[in-house]
């Protein structure tokens, strides 16, 4: 019997206390890793959204500069969000905010501004508003502005151009959404054709 008892005491393995301590330590380590991964993932998403917002803002400014810089005439009587004529193709154009981002629309000088943002028939084709920056480039974000104006000194000024996350954005209350990127309050773009006289 003594031989049997000695054998049992010398058996390799864990006691119940050692096993429970090991399980407890492993569960604490696992919980820490899982929590850390979710925090890192959330931080990465925030950084990625801010970077995408800066890219969208830069792309939008480049597109706006392409449109504004080549204007050759301005529609008179519209101090805010005026229509302007592009040199390329001789088309009148108007910019507008929409639920999908900033859109531009080809129109005639005599078109009713109340129709902007809707389908308008011009000469032989129906022109729908088109996004200034494609949906793919927007990456779930939306660019929005308060207004743009034209001054007789030859500058278009866009006011409060900013980027929001599209999900949950309400255009009627933009102040309720987080701004991911923005330009200074007023950003001016020079018209390369000089000072245009409103028509």
Feature-to-residue mapping (PLM):
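Short coil/loop residues immediately preceding or within conserved phosphate-binding loops
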Residues: 11
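Short, well-structured beta-strand/strand-turn elements
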Residues: 69-78
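Type IV pilin-like appendage domain
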Residues: 77-157, 164-169, 175-178, 182, ...
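Aliphatic-rich helix starts adjacent to a transmembrane/signal segment
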Residues: 2-4, 14-69
């Amino acid at each position: 019997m003594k031989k049997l008892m000695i054998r049992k005491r010398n058996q390799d393995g864990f006691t119940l206390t050692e096993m429970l301590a090991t399980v407890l330590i492993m569960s604490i380590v696992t919980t820490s890793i899982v929590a850390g991964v979710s925090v890192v993932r959330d931080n990465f998403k925030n950084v990625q959204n801010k970077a995408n917002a800066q890219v969208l803002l830069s792309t939008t400014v480049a597109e706006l500069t392409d449109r504004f810089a080549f204007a050759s005439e301005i529609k008179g009587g519209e101090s805010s969000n005026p229509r302007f004529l592009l040199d390329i193709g001789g088309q009148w154009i108007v910019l507008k905010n929409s639920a999908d981002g900033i859109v531009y629309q080809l129109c005639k000088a005599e078109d009713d501004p109340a129709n902007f943002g809707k389908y308008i028939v011009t000469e032989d084709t129906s022109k729908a508003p088109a996004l200034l920056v494609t949906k793919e480039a927007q990456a779930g974000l939306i660019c929005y502005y308060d207004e743009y104006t034209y001054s007789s000194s030859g500058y278009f000024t866009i006011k409060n151009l900013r980027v929001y996350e599209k999900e949950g954005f309400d255009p009627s209350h933009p102040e309720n959404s987080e701004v991911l990127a923005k330009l200074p309050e007023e950003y001016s773009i020079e018209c390369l054709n000089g000072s245009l006289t409103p028509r």
